[in-house]
Every structure is written in structure tokens, then in C-alpha cells.
Design a protein with these regions (language model features):
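Short, solvent-exposed loop/turn segments that connect beta-strands within catalytic domains
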Residues: 33-36, 68-70, 352-355
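Short beta-strand and strand-turn-strand segments in soluble, beta-rich domains
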Residues: 30-39, 86
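Structural motif
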Residues: 5-23, 32-34
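Short glycine/proline/serine/threonine-rich loop/turn segments at secondary-structure transition edges
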Residues: 59-73
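Conserved, single-site charged/polar hotspot
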Residues: 1-3, 24-28, 43, 47-56, ...
Length: 410
């Protein structure tokens, strides 16, 4: 989607708590802090989607160097649909030239008042507590510590939305990829060079997988994986806006993490902004952006900060997925069991998203399958090629698992 200067776009996707898109919902978008402004009204299509391509935003230059000007504009989103409770989200972030994605789940009407969701400001703009330093490599057996024998990509991250010791903070169960996308969109700007985004995503993933692998908080008696408190972990914001380019990078790289020779655990790759806070031996976010401007690749940026011996590793074990990627793209002319598996999953997803169309399960990747894949990609924010690549395969698997699990629990 082409976006002109000083505007960004927002794609709002509305579902109910059974993962069905809500058609005909009224969506109102207005700038925050401007009570007299006129709200733009939209109505969701059969996929529960509306897109506003013309939301004013500050000059992109504000997000490319630290400064005194807020680099994003903020909007309110109000959603009404017959039979559902109203939702109001304030603080939706829009960057010039970027495609934002706002997922909103509606719950059945129960007569309760609207409970506004106010999104936190970005970490590079707002001041948050600096990270308390920890070792990059954890002791192997601190009082019965590390128990996993291999690195596993978890299906779900349990996020404690506060400090570890805060018993009033809510725990959220978040799909792993969604957690990584959320953190990345709250820790760095989506306007940065591709190499900088990739370097930071890899650091975020390795940080997270170290928490998973070491069972860091469970070993301390807590029932969560990570916190949202920046003094202890990474910034995660409930219902935050996700940016399309960051989302696609995570879909491509989600099974990767950072390693050193002869070390099994993912490295605990800590970082800071590098301007308001200094952190020798860690990656700095603004520094990674400068190195990307100079032409360094993601791994070169990471080695600059974490040492020449680190390398990108890949987990072969992805939890909660019915079948692993075949190792090659599926496209028109492909055939076999993997195509049949893909078709079965698409056919099930199409019960929730009829726009995907009727999918014939015959093990032959023809035009019908390619069209269904293309429509799926359009709905779920992937490049619409009609080809099932790595990121499409695992996105289809994720959505399939989501709709079937919910259906089983209804």
C-alpha cells in the first residue's frame, strides 16, 4: 500500500471471542486530545476489517533521530456492533509512511459499561525504568534451575503486566509471535532500516527464549514467563498497535535466536536506548539504527555489541503446530501430503472467514488453492503472493490452531 508523506494507514481487524470476524461493526477514529474534532466513521467488511489510509502523522524524520518532537500521532478508536459490548482504545500510534494494524476483540453484550483501554507511550519517547543488569548466560543449575534440554518455541507466553512482585497485575496468555511483534513495536520504531529492525527482533526473541528455556520466573515461584516491566523484561502493551513491516519480519524469523559456541541456552541479549541510558556490553537501540544506516547487516550489528562469536540459531521445535514447514515453498504445481494438510487447515479457517472461499482437499496445489492462500495472506497481513512460504505456512497453522481450539471449548 503506497502512503504519501506525513500520513499513515491503520487497518482495524475486529473479531468476537470465538475468532469470527464481525461484519457491519461501526468504527470511529479521531485524534486524541482533540474533543471537538470530527470522528471518521467506517463499517467493517465480511472479514471484520476497515482501513483508513489517510491519518495525519508527524514527519518521518522525527523517528529517525532522538529529539523533542513526538514522532507519531495518537488516535482514539471506538467500536460498536449489535450484540457486543462497546470497545474504546486510546493512544493508537500512527507513524508517517507506515501501515498500522489494530486487532480488537469484542465480547457479547452483558450490560457493563465501556472500559477504555489506554495504550502506553512508546519506550523511545516516554521514560521507563532502565533494565536491571543480568548475566547473558545463566547458571546451568541454580537451585534446580534449567530443566529444558533443548530450545523450544513456545505456543504461548504468559505475560505478567507489572513488576514480578505485584500481585495485583494481570497475567495475559499471548501467542509467542504476537508477543514478539508487540514488544518490537513498543521498543523500536517501524520506520527504521530493515537491518536494524531484524537485529532488534533477534535480540528480543533471544531475550524471551532465554526466559522460557531457563524457566526464570517459575524457578522463583511465579506462574508466568515474563513481565511487562522494563526494569526486569521488555515493554509489552496490552492491545498495542502492530506495524505491518515488523509483523512480517517476525513471521519470517520467529524461530531464530542468538547463540554462542558450546552454549545451549539462547543468549539473554539485553539492550537499552543508548541516549538516555547507557549500557556497556549491550546493544543500544539508537546505535543499531545508526549502524544499519552505515550499511551493516543484522548479524554484523549484533556482533558489534555482543561479540564476534555470536551466531543466529534456529529452533527445530515449535510447540502447538500440527505439522512443520516442508522446507520449500508450496505453489501451483506442488502436490502431496503437505498440500493436503494446508488445504485442510484453510478449509477449516474458511468456516470463520468465508472470503477465503471453498477449498478442495485433493493434495494438488492448483489455482483454487493459490487463490485461497492469497486471500488468507490479505486478511492476515502477509504479502499476497498466493505462494505458501515459511511465514505463510506457520501463520496458517497459528490461525488454524486458534479457530479449532476455540471451537473445541465452545
Amino acid at each position: 500500500m503506497a502512503i504519501t508523506n506525513n500520513v499513515g494507514s491503520l487497518k482495524i481487524q475486529i473479531t468476537n471471542n470465538n475468532f469470527f470476524p464481525i461484519e457491519g461493526a461501526s468504527v470511529y477514529i479521531s485524534p486524541t486530545g482533540m474533543p471537538d474534532s470530527t470522528s471518521e466513521e467506517f463499517v467493517t467488511d465480511e472479514n471484520g476489517i476497515v482501513i483508513d489510509e489517510e491519518l495525519p502523522a508527524p514527519d518521518v524524520a522525527y523517528s529517525l533521530e532522538p529529539g523533542e518532537n513526538q514522532p507519531y500521532s495518537e488516535y482514539n478508536v471506538l467500536v460498536n456492533a449489535p450484540g457486543y459490548n462497546e470497545r474504546f482504545i486510546s493512544g493508537v500510534q500512527i507513524f508517517s509512511g507506515e501501515n498500522g494494524i489494530q486487532n480488537i476483540e469484542l465480547t457479547p453484550s452483558d450490560g457493563s459499561d465501556t472500559n477504555p483501554t489506554v495504550l502506553d507511550a512508546h519506550t523511545l519517547w516516554e521514560q521507563y525504568p532502565p533494565k536491571i543488569a543480568e548475566d547473558m548466560i545463566k547458571p546451568v543449575n541454580p537451585s534446580g534451575g534449567i530443566v529444558l534440554s533443548r530450545v523450544v518455541i513456545p505456543e504461548t507466553i504468559v505475560v505478567h503486566d507489572g513488576a514480578p512482585t505485584d500481585p495485583t497485575a494481570r497475567d495475559y496468555y499471548v501467542p509467542y509471535k504476537d508477543y514478539i511483534k508487540n514488544v518490537a513495536c513498543n521498543e523500536i520504531y517501524s520506520t527504521w532500516p530493515d537491518a536494524a529492525i531484524r537485529a532488534n527482533v533477534l535480540a528480543i526473541q533471544s531475550f524471551t527464549l532465554n526466559r522460557v528455556y531457563t524457566e526464570w520466573y517459575r524457578g522463583k515461584g511465579y506462574d508466568f514467563t515474563v513481565t511487562s516491566n522494563t526494569a526486569f523484561d521488555q515493554k509489552w502493551v496490552y492491545n498495542a498497535t502492530i506495524f505491518e513491516n515488523v509483523s512480517q519480519i517476525v513471521d519470517e524469523m520467529f524461530a531464530n535466536y542468538l547463540s554462542k559456541p558450546n552454549v545451549t541456552q539462547p543468549l539473554f541479549t539485553q539492550y537499552c536506548d543508548g541516549r538516555r541510558v547507557s549500557c556497556p556490553g549491550w546493544m543500544t537501540q539508537w546505535g543499531s539504527k545508526s549502524l544499519a544506516d552505515d550499511g551493516l547487516t543484522a548479524i554484523q550489528i549484533l556482533r558489534y555489541y555482543y561479540g564476534d562469536t555470536i551466531y543466529i540459531n534456529t529452533s527445530e521445535t515449535i510447540s502447538g503446530i500440527p505439522s512443520s514447514y516442508p522446507g520449500y515453498e508450496l505453489t501451483i504445481g506442488s502436490s502431496g501430503d503437505k498440500v493436503s494438510q494446508l488445504q485442510r487447515q484453510l478449509a477449516r479457517i474458511s468456516l470463520n472467514y468465508p472470503a477465503i472461499g471453498t477449498v478442495t482437499v485433493d493434495g494438488l496445489y492448483g489455482q483454487n488453492t493459490a487463490d485461497a492462500v492469497r486471500k488468507f495472506q490479505q486478511i492476515f497481513n502477509l504479502p499476497a503472493t498466493g505462494v505458501t512460504d515459511y511465514k505463510t505456512w506457520y501463520k496458517i497453522s497459528q490461525i488454524y490452531v486458534g479457530v479449532t481450539k476455540i471451537a473445541e471449548n465452545v
